[in-house]
Amino acid sequence: MAATCEISNVFSNYFNAMYSSEDPTLAPAPLTTFGTEDFVLTLNNQHMSPEGPVGCVGPQTRSQRDRTEPPAVLHLAEKASWTGERPQFWSKTQVLDWISYQVEKNKYDASSIDFSRCDMDGATLCNCALEELRLVFGPLGDQLHAQLRDLTSSSSDELSWIIELLEKDGMTFQEGLGDSGPFDQGSPFAQELLDDGRQASPYYGSSYGPGAPSPGSSDFSTSGTDTPQSSHSSDSGGSDVDLDLTDSKVFPRDGFPDYKKGEPKHGKRKRGRPRKLSKEYWDCLEGKKSKHAPRGTHLWEFIRDILIHPELNEGLMKWENRHEGVFKFLRSEAVAQLWGQKKKNSNMTYEKLSRAMRYYYKREILERVDGRRLVYKFGKNSSGWKEEEVGESQN
């Protein structure tokens, strides 16, 4: 019932705007102009006659209208709330405004519309099939479907342009394992974990026997509170799994003082406390990971790269305090859609993206700024966002 009242108010506002006059003593009917390219309903106050309304003008091209229309002509489409915004991000009110505009533009009988089914936002409207629009709007459904297709295709081209620039700058992404996106595995972070492990691990691509444990399994992870391996994995921004790379072909065994010739090549470790690895080992490991991990492959890196590239950050995000690493989402759903395109997930939303960002809190890569909506901060284990770091990477 409330939705029907709101829709009625929207239609009333449009009728008031159409039939109102600057002179309260005159209330002539509007002058309508119909173009061959599209129908534009205009209100002309300068050409009104005190004796009555002026008749309808015949078909004109867009260029002819531009030359003949006076400055006082009110274009409803230009004044509407939905202009300048992508249909996917329209609010319920903007959807109603757009439907009202289409009804007036096409001279459609509004009484035949099922108002109870118009209470939807832009994302829901864009997901409606042609048959659904015909069911709700009748013959007008074909016109609405065609207009939506044109509007959404233009906005998709803009997002694709940003993705293309990100890729040209070296921010490539890994294809999913036959999955539609990073958040369809039960947990919103499942695919992100898998991607991170695949990209950072030198074991990726090799095969293991049935009895040999794989990297990241319980046989390779260490236990205890004082082991450097466990604490170091939480400090690293490049990998989301614990790795023991002493068996990797990338690192020769002879280069590490803790290596013993008699250790088995695969299988479970011997009983006892896990061996402690030297600082040189971790320095070498970090160097290898930083060279092989592609840029922009993790969510926090994707956010960082948008912030540090002004040519890509067209009102998507902004720095609140660059020195402290504090930033804010300005168009959160647009950023989520970009991340969804990057991960081949068309159902990505900011709600899912924000849940994925929480995963980085424990690792101190990202921090939430208390009391401020859409505001976050890079943690001590993040990198590549400081001005001096950006300058060094460009040299």
From Swiss-Prot:
Keywords, comma-separated and alphabetical: Activator, Cytoplasm, Developmental protein, Differentiation, DNA-binding, Inflammatory response, Nucleus, Repressor, Transcription, Transcription regulation
Bias (Basic residues): 266-275
Ranges of the DNA-binding region feature: 297-379
Q: Which domain of life is it from?
A: Eukaryota
Q: Which residues form the PNT domain?
A: 69-155
**What gene makes this protein?**
Elf3
Q: What is the lineage of its organism?
A: Eukaryota, Metazoa, Chordata, Craniata, Vertebrata
Subunit structure as annotated in this protein's UniProt entry = Interacts with TBP. Interacts with CREBBP and EP300; these act as transcriptional coactivators of ELF3 and positively modulate its function. Interacts with XRCC5/KU86 and XRCC6/KU70; these inhibit the ability of ELF3 to bind DNA and negatively modulate its transcriptional activity. Associated with CLND7 and POU2F3. Interacts with ZNF768.
Q: What is this protein called?
A: ETS-related transcription factor Elf-3
User: Where is this protein primarily located?
Assistant: cytoplasm
Please give the InterPro entries that the UniProt record associates with this protein: Elf-3_PNT, Ets_dom, ETS_fam, Pointed_dom, SAM/pointed_sf, WH-like_DNA-bd_sf, WH_DNA-bd_sf
PANTHER family per UniProt: ETS, ETS-RELATED TRANSCRIPTION FACTOR ELF-3
The similarity annotation says:
Belongs to the ETS family.
GO biological-process terms attached to the record: anatomical structure morphogenesis; blastocyst development; cell differentiation; extracellular matrix organization; inflammatory response; mammary gland involution; negative regulation of DNA-templated transcription; positive regulation of transcription by RNA polymerase II
Name the CDD domains for this protein: SAM_PNT-ESE-1-like (cd08537)
Organism (species): Rattus norvegicus (Rat)
* GO MF annotation, one: RNA polymerase II cis-regulatory region sequence-specific DNA binding
Compositional bias segments (type: Basic and acidic residues)? 246-265
Location in the cell reads: Cytoplasm; Nucleus
